[in-house]
Amino acid sequence: MKKIGLASDHAGFELKEYVKTWLKAKNYPFEDFGTYSTDSCDYPDFAHPLALAVEAGECYPGIAICGSGEGISMTLNKHQGIRAALCWMPEIAHLARQHNDANVLVMPGRFIDNEMADKIMNEFFSTDFDTCEVNFTL
């Protein structure tokens, strides 16, 4: 398995630290692109390096967290090769992987707890892209 890339801003830092514990327990390698504290910061400073690493194939998938998840999602999705999906419940994570081939999971740090993050990550990591979604003709 490739390294999983992680990024957050200050509002997502605590959940990101929990995600690191979750990944370690499952023996998933990861790279943390920051932030490294709860000090106020700008999410693009950490979203762009994560997006570049996923685009380059250095990390797959990515996990990004900010307060609402919206800002970091918008920044990530400015990158051509990124399909970041904001997921606040497992069903959305499932559909994001199955139908949209999401390569970055985004979670809202201010609106979900660790238990919900567990469920979302389990669903995201256990769902494959359904390739029939791309096998159609117009």
Which functions belong to the PLM regions below?
Residues G5-A7, A11-G12, P90-L138:
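C-terminal binding/interaction regions
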Residues L6-A25:
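Glycine-rich phosphate/diphosphate-binding loop of Rossmann-like nucleotide-binding domains
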